Amino acid sequence: MKLIGITGMPGSGKSAIINLAKENNIPVVSMGDIVRHETLKQGLILNPENVGKTAIFLRKLHGKEAIVVPCLKYIFEKYKNEKFVVIEGIRSIYEVNYLKKHVFLEIIAIHSSPKTRFERLSARNREDDSNSLDTFIERDNRELDFSIGSVISLADYVVVNEEEYDKFLENLNSLLKKIIMNVDE
């Protein structure tokens, strides 16, 4: 099995590659879903503050691999016969190291400027997003505290999402095919 890890700051455009993976019948597992699930289990509403606090709590309680361990277990149980699985939401170098100990992993980082990301997050209106600049900056700092910057800098591929959306999708689709086929187009 080969894992295709997706990383990037909130609002960078990670959902585009998730949608492409699904269109290509590649299973997708989101690490954020585990955190959101745990937030709800604690009886909290989904908002940036509660989701962030839950992520920090889980890491304090179970260590720096707190999110990735149940994720990989889930992948092995549910998708053991798949050649490829996309895992979205890798945020720390500890998660990368854990995954690489257990499975072949290639990482795609999606990058967008803070200005672009803030505009997207303000517009998409997901429960754990905010249109407050202060909350946006807080969230970015929390992500950076998890060491997402290290994951992005060590990614096997970096795709910049500042251009026209169709061109971005075209670039992502080509990259996904390259990884799956293991050939250059």
From Swiss-Prot:
Keywords: ATP-binding, Nucleotide-binding. It comes from the Archaea. ATP binds at residues 8-15. InterPro entries: NTP_hydrolase-rel, P-loop_NTPase. GO terms for molecular function: ATP binding. Disulfide bonds: none annotated. The keyword DNA damage does not apply. Belongs to the UPF0200 family. This is UPF0200 protein Mevan_0592. It comes from Methanococcus vannielii (strain ATCC 35089 / DSM 1224 / JCM 13029 / OCM 148 / SB). The lineage of its organism: Archaea, Methanobacteriati, Methanobacteriota, Methanomada group, Methanococci.
